[in-house]
Amino acid sequence: MPLSQTAMRFAGHVAYHEYEGPAFNRAERERLIADLGNRNAMILRNHGLLVCAPSIPQAFNLIYWLEQACKIQVDILSCNRPLHLPTTDVVEGTSEALSGMEITLDNEASTNPALKDGAQKAGSGYGLLEWPALLRALDRQDPSYRD
């Protein structure tokens, strides 16, 4: 539901898959692929979230913000008050605007030399600027994840 700007990023870009029990059935793979289609985010009903992305930073960003959108929706619905939904034009415009805001690190590296090495490795997309900072925080907290 487009109840927040965060959720509007995903408007029309989320697939859904019905819960089929624990994923032991290999035949479910084909149904998951079919349900996902050309989208990169999926809500597995009564189960959880699934995302696909060309890089780990992009996948992390996608799952993080999809989860935030879901949390906001749960919070709003738990208020048991009438919903105020934006118009379709606003939802579509916001979704389109946010879809076009992906960061290209090559462009960022031209103004911030510290990003040059990361830019060459990462490419472009959401999450690429945040990812090095998240790894530095993890290195400080518990560097054993690299082993």
Over which residues does each language-model region extend?
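Glycine-rich flexible loops
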Residues: 1-147
